From Swiss-Prot:
Its EC number is 3.1.1.4. GO terms for cellular component: extracellular region. GO terms for molecular function: phospholipase A2 activity. It comes from Micrurus tener microgalbineus (Spotted coral snake). The keyword Calcium applies. Expressed by the venom gland. This is Phospholipase A2 1. It comes from the Eukaryota. It catalyses: a 1,2-diacyl-sn-glycero-3-phosphocholine + H2O = a 1-acyl-sn-glycero-3-phosphocholine + a fatty acid + H(+). GO terms for biological process: lipid catabolic process. Binds 1 Ca(2+) ion.
Length: 12
């Protein structure tokens, strides 16, 4: 899912 993808990338 895109949301999961974004969350994974922006995992600060």
């Amino acid at each position: 899912s895109l949301l999961b993808f974004k969350b994974m990338i922006e995992s600060t």
